[in-house]
Amino acid sequence: MTAQNPNLAALSAAGVSVWLDDLSRDRLRSGNLQELIDTKCVVGVTTNPSIFQKAFAEGHAYDSQIAELAARGADVDATIRTVTTDDVRNACDVLTREWENSDGVDGRVSIEVDPRLAGDTDKTIAQAVELWKIVDRPNLFIKIPATQAGLPAITAVLAEGISVNVTLIFSVERYRAVMDAYLAGMEKAREAGHDLSKIHSVASFFVSRVDTEIDKRLEKIGGERALALRGQAGVANARLAYAAYQEVFEGGQRYQALKADGARVQRPLWASTGVKNPDYSDTLYVTELVAPNTVNTMPEKTIDAVADHGVIRGDTVTGTGPDAQRVFDELAAVGVDLPDVFVVLENEGVEKFVDSWTELMEETQKQLGSASK
């Protein structure tokens, strides 16, 4: 058996599931995904519109399937749906062993609803159900954004017995609403007679984008006190989120009642963990966010950085809430408008995915056009 990288093995042993934030047909065909499972402790995959847009734009792995779909008269939406769900289904199959070995906790692959639906609850629910049926794998996660319209969709989709990855969470306040939506969904699933032990969920809390936005504002404010806070907000925010998770799932009565009927915790997932600022350690959002019952989904570059020089020191999150709160108190004191930061980040997050989806549609249209000539 191939040996696992010791740094990533230490991360896994500390309770962090390592997931790959990427997927492409080339990665599946070459056996690279299986190799990462065997050597880099990868036990899950996340995708998003930007990842698929990049996969479509690079190389020719999709050419023959798109030509076949063009010959059948498939439109752009149908083509994207077929191609992306095929990749996700194949990735689910590659990760079946990890899914079985973890009793369904890991071995998960996430596919996102069309980001253009982020403001439409009913259409989000309908597409989530449709994607679940098309992929037809028990280790699938449907990604739903934590927008105001997304929250009731999360509850409704979980109530159908469908596992959900809640994405685009930036603030602890919104994260609390997400946990509430999860518990409401599980209560409804119980009423409907679903086996709660088979319904899983993660809450994807974005990290590096918080630093990018807040650092920009700190530089504008200027002065020693403000500048000293750069690079601290992302980790502090995630640590406060973990404290909220512990409050709800380790001490909360509402969850305990569901747990008695087999419900799992909704694990926090650290997303956007690739470091954007070259002044910071490229493993910052991994080594500083080690905690039991968490997931860290990373681009391959970050996985490689952790494998090469990541120092895993055990749990770096539990008990850090008061220090993290001090960072936020200080940010407010120097004049950072935190509520505005989180509104901007959510809007930008949705816009980025919509832009990627638009590019994906344009690329697909171009390929369908070429194939039908």
Curated annotation (Swiss-Prot):
Instruction: Report the pathway entry.
Output: Carbohydrate degradation; pentose phosphate pathway; D-glyceraldehyde 3-phosphate and beta-D-fructose 6-phosphate from D-ribose 5-phosphate and D-xylulose 5-phosphate (non-oxidative stage): step 2/3
GO BP terms in the entry: carbohydrate metabolic process; pentose-phosphate shunt
Keyword Transferase belongs to the record: yes
A GO term for molecular function: transaldolase activity
Q: What CDD domains would the database entry show?
A: Transaldolase_like
Q: Which reaction does it catalyse?
A: D-sedoheptulose 7-phosphate + D-glyceraldehyde 3-phosphate = D-erythrose 4-phosphate + beta-D-fructose 6-phosphate
- Which superkingdom does the taxonomy of this entry point to? Bacteria
Q: Name one GO cellular component term.
A: cytoplasm
Q: Name one Pfam family in it.
A: TAL_FSA
Query: Which Enzyme Commission number(s) are listed?
Result: 2.2.1.2
Provide the protein's localization.
Cytoplasm
Sorted keywords for this record are: Cytoplasm, Pentose shunt, Schiff base, Transferase
Family label = Belongs to the transaldolase family. Type 2 subfamily.
Q: Which NCBIfam families match?
A: PRK03343.1, tal_mycobact
In its UniProt entry, what is this protein called? Transaldolase
Natural source organism:
Mycolicibacterium paratuberculosis (strain ATCC BAA-968 / K-10) (Mycobacterium paratuberculosis)
Organism lineage reads as: Bacteria, Bacillati, Actinomycetota, Actinomycetes, Mycobacteriales
